[in-house]
UniProtKB/Swiss-Prot annotation:
Keyword Ribonucleoprotein in annotation: yes
PANTHER family, A to Z: LARGE RIBOSOMAL SUBUNIT PROTEIN BL27M (PTHR15893:SF0), RIBOSOMAL PROTEIN L27 (PTHR15893)
Protein known as: Large ribosomal subunit protein bL27
A GO-annotated cellular component: cytosolic large ribosomal subunit
Region annotation (Disordered) ranges: 13-35
Length: 96
């Protein structure tokens, strides 16, 4: 009897290297303080790339467009017209 051992398909596929499998670390952008929250001067309010939100009253803008409080007070997110937003910090009145 004649025994035929024919293989038409590879039993082992060739193993190549992948070019995937990398990802950058998240930059943790976005709001760091909420509307109505009390903050101290120097507190970071919003981390962003570009000016998604503009600095308002008592708010400064850092070199990487981070918004920070210049004084102690309460955070307020406000609208500027139809398509702009700003964040302001209003000092709390001191009771004597």
């Amino acid at each position: 009897m004649l025994r035929l051992d024919l293989q038409f398909f590879a039993s082992k596929k060739g193993v190549g290297s992948t070019k995937n499998g990398r990802d950058s670390q998240s930059k943790r952008l976005g709001a760091k303080r909420a509307d109505g929250q009390t903050v101290t001067g120097g507190s970071i309010l919003y981390r962003q790339r570009g000016t998604k939100i503009y600095p308002g009253v008592n708010v400064g803008r850092g070199g990487d467009d981070t918004l920070y409080a210049k004084v102690d007070g309460v955070v307020r997110f406000e609208r500027l017209g139809r398509d702009r937003k700003q964040v302001s910090v209003y000092p709390v009145a001191q009771e004597a």
